[in-house]
């Protein structure tokens, strides 16, 4: 019994600032795509991921204005395993020159390349579209910084890949990073919750 409580979500971004929204990501968010090899230019390493190879690196141009995004970014990427399995670890960083900060990551056993819990048999040499999803994040990329994506076989806090077979990264229209843009002009999302009780309003 009693009045219905207000329903909202409190979000903290990677700089420690808080805001409030009725849903997350915010309603009507614009979705922006960064194609690998285009908006995310190939910046280093070969196009092959294996436990012994250097990172495959992609990076944007410096942003002309502050860029905010949140939710669970998606990385859908064409890959060609050279064995009966493989693993991909994707690291997103906010970079200012050579100084980078980890803002999010995702990891996938390629036997589950379609997403969900359905296991698939991997045929060597057959190209797949791996549908990866990052852990939830809320990120501010300052003006002049870049967004960097690094691909490797595993992360520092994860077990080694189940197979050492290399995985080739394929560029093209179906290899994209998708993010939900946070609009800082929507000021009501950045105001703290307001008390509407008569005792508050009368103060």
Language-model region placement:
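Glycine/threonine-rich phosphate-binding loop and adjacent beta-strand/alpha-helix elements that clamp
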Residues: 1-203
């Amino acid at each position: 019994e009693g009045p219905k409580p207000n329903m909202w979500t409190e979000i903290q971004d990677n700089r420690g600032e808080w805001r409030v929204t009725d849903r997350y990501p915010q309603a009507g968010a614009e979705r922006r795509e960064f194609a690998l090899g285009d908006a995310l230019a190939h910046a280093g390493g070969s196009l092959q991921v294996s436990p012994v190879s250097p990172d495959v690196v992609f990076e944007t141009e410096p942003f002309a204005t502050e860029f905010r995004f949140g939710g669970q970014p998606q990385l859908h990427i064409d890959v060609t395993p050279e064995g009966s399995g493989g693993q991909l670890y994707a690291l997103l960083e906010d970079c200012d020159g050579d100084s980078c900060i980890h803002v999010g990551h995702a990891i996938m056993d390629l036997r589950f390349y379609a997403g969900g819990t359905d296991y698939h048999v991997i045929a060597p040499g057959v190209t797949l579209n791996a549908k990866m999803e990052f852990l939830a994040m809320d990120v501010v990329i300052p003006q002049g910084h870049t967004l960097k994506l690094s691909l490797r076989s595993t992360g520092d806090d994860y077990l080694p890949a189940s197979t050492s077979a290399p995985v080739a990264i394929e560029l093209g229209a179906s290899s994209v990073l998708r993010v939900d843009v946070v609009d800082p002009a929507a000021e009501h999302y950045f105001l703290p919750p307001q008390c509407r009780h008569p005792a508050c309003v009368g103060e």
